[in-house]
Amino acid sequence: MSFAAGEGGWIAIAGLGPGDDALVTPEVDAALAAATDVVGYIPYVARVAPRAGLALHPSDNRVELDRAAHALELAAQGRRVVVVSSGDPGVFAMASALFEALEVGPAHWRDIDIRVLPGITAMLAAAARAGAPLGHDFCAINLSDNLKPWSLIEKRLRLAAEADFAMAFYNPRSASRPEGFVRTLALLRELCGDARPILFARAVTTAQETLHIVPLGQARADMADMRTMVIVGSSRTRIIERARGPILYTPRGISDEVAG
């Protein structure tokens, strides 16, 4: 799809990837080059280079619906707006928030050209750095209880462990709610045992990147923060030890005997 000027207002909800600018897609770069406005959370807008003719609209966390409404109104006025998210905009990010605002907003917003531009989400970047821990069935769970109760998070953790999924956790731990990840680790040790491998991948693809693979029995809540992607293997996930560093992977197949 073209992002040329002179076509009226539009919105591109764009994923900036996990951190390395080399992982931003050409489609997202083209949208940013054509944009008149960039809207997003402060650290994500900071990743966009300023230039003449481009207005930057950074905003604080937890104002996603206000941010979405602002972007929609700008586009309704004929502006070319890029709403930026880290990773992929459709994975625990701004695409859903914008469509929530669109659904309840003024009727004229529905005439706006809206496009979602995918990016590399942190889950996939972290998995690639470690090997292939998501090589078989897996699930992604947001551990933040800002938009859902802990009881629902616990239910999903239990069911995922029972089904023997590998599990990828977004937003595992913050300063305001450190107890949630403590409870998560305790529950996983109860359900999966102490030997299950767990990956802590922090600030993946940036200069601050760190990777740690430990057994669940040695995992501590303070190994994670809001910049950390946590991946827990399934019962089939393996570690290949080598001098260049371990490889964490999950085999592609499961026999009928094992599955039964």
For every predicted segment, state its role:
Residues R62-R67, A122, N146-K148, T205-Q208:
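A short acidic, often aromatic-flanked loop/helix-cap motif at beta-alpha or helix-coil junctions
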